């Protein structure tokens, strides 16, 4: 080996470069959530995020074209976490009926559980404004969140527990009903008692799929 070459800096490995890129993006997302929680939607500025993260403008544009792209990434992260939780709670339930009830309860938690309501409220009031710009991304997020419900309804049909001619359509109806009232309550601060919402939502679900 040429001694002259041995002292030269070696090219950074692809893995290390990828890890550094991921770390930088994670720092931006963490800082963005901190700024959003502190300043709210209307006080959210890219400059504040960069100060919080200790990163440059160049760092921002390596990952995002504009502020709304960063907000979308935050929303995808939050909804991705929600989807994981929904799958976990439904998987832990014993019967299809239990799975659907667990799914509904976990969704409503986002408007009433103290550790979940803050991020839920930040996005609940503005996701409709972002929807026209990012319809495909929203469709993917909804499909991921809705998947455990679709599976539970299909399982209930297969064992004769539910009656549904179109489990996916029924899952869509149930999802948007529950997610809609949850988003409203997250925005309003949970002014309507949870039990009252359950009395409205559950009879509809029972009629729609034969929930026991």
Model region roles, listed by residue range:
Residues 1-23:
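N-terminal intrinsically disordered/low-complexity leader segments
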Residues 27, 35-69, 73:
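Helix-turn-helix
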Residues 108-150:
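Short secondary-structure transition hinges
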Residues 21-32, 49, 74-82, 86, ...:
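Generic hydrophobic, amphipathic alpha-helix propensity
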Residues 109-113, 151, 155, 174-192, ...:
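Amphipathic C-terminal alpha-helical segment
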Residues 80-83, 132-159, 168-173, 199:
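Amphipathic alpha-helical packing segments from all-alpha helical-bundle domains
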Residues 73, 77, 87-114, 171-174, ...:
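Hydrophobic alpha-helical connector segments
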């Amino acid at each position: 080996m040429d001694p002259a070459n041995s002292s030269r800096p070696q090219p950074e490995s692809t893995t290390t470069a990828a890890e550094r890129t991921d770390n930088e993006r994670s720092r931006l997302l963490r800082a963005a959530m901190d700024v959003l929680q502190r300043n709210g939607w209307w006080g959210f500025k890219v400059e504040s995020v960069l100060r919080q993260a200790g990163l440059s403008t160049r760092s921002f544009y390596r990952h995002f074209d504009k502020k709304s792209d960063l907000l979308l990434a935050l929303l995808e992260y939050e909804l991705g976490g929600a989807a994981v939780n929904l799958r976990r709670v439904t998987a832990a339930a014993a019967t299809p009926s239990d799975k659907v009830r667990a799914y509904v309860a976990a969704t409503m938690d986002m408007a009433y559980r103290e550790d979940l309501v803050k991020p839920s409220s930040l996005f609940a009031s503005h996701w409709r404004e972002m929807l026209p710009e990012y319809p495909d991304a929203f469709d993917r997020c909804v499909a991921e969140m809705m998947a455990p419900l679709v599976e539970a309804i299909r399982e209930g049909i297969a064992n004769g527990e539910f009656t549904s001619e179109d489990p996916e359509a029924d899952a869509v109806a149930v999802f948007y009903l529950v997610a809609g009232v949850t988003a409203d309550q997250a925005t309003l601060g949970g002014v309507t008692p949870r039990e009252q919402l359950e009395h409205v939502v559950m009879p509809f679900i029972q009629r729609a799929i034969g929930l026991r």
